[in-house]
């Protein structure tokens, strides 16, 4: 393993821009690390070495020409390679969503996020492993096998975006993209000592992000430092007329906020500790101790810390696991074997309805089928008002809790997860235990607000990573970066997985 791959993205970008190292060299170093380690971690579903090297060569040429002409580079991250979660469409490599039903399928169009990455001169190393259609908290629901946590290969890396987080922790990539439906960026970040951000809903385009639950899904940036995450956030955010839920608002200056925060002054910043997310069944002592230490550190930086009550958070899990399956049952109806993807039983003797049934039975995994059935039940005529409508009312109350909290504080904090990474297979047969792992993260998806997980050290219980979750109101993503960068700087360097 070369020292090059251990550098943060901002440093790599500066070296590439100064032509101290080429984008091709950096990309090749990452590809070499993937080749050397991914048999153990299985972070990637598809490695696009040729395409990544071609993109890197194009960037090197552009930098040479821009330098000669005194022009600007394509972006502040030009030439820095990236791992892309396999839920974003790409025209030059498969998009499977971790499902057999899309095995081998290549999209005819790029997602907006993919297109922005290409325009910014960021080589895409490949597509990372994930829970099937982003349904899961461990990446064990992937049809192509689980991803292993580089900190302990007997443990999960979190989910649904465990592949992207593991790729960062294993130094296979300095940058990654994930999607967050109930914590799928923040939770894996916490378990792998990386940084992950769920932006405000609607501020990063969902065009080409294959939907799990449309009102909850949000693409976002992942990296090993807060500044790197901010730089990537700036690249992918912005209004997109092709996404009907896209917010036409200015992107907050997240990079400026991260740089300001790194100076370590939080005087006047009001931080609320969410009462409902700091204790209870399932919280490990080591996680709570790490959280308490993080809050003390924030106080030492000058922040004004108080406890905040969000009473309806106690009902967020129940509401989420009615709303999400309901949207899943609708969104996944399109995967029927008729137009693209897997087709089973089409031998000339079966009807279209039979082919659809056989295709879906063979193509979807157990967790996807479970959520489709729950959602269909919740949306049925006899139960729509009793279940789905009630869940939406609770969702409104959760959003009101947050709005009320932000009248007295600027950001909220909590543990990112109740425990550190659990062992592979430990919760696979217990869906409720798996769902409870999202307890700290999913309220923000219900409200559409933004959140970050930043590493807060290693748990004294098992020496595995712990994450601090920072939350902010909609369109105040810059607050996450100011507080996160200040905490990161005060916390100091942490051990790495490798």
UniProtKB/Swiss-Prot annotation:
Keyword Iron: no
Active site per UniProt: 85, 160, 184
Enzyme class: ligase
Keyword Nucleotide-binding in annotation: yes
Enzyme Commission number, as recorded: 6.3.5.7
Keywords: ATP-binding, Ligase, Nucleotide-binding, Protein biosynthesis
Family as reported in the entry's similarity comment: Belongs to the amidase family. GatA subfamily.
Name listed for the protein in its UniProt record: Glutamyl-tRNA(Gln) amidotransferase subunit A
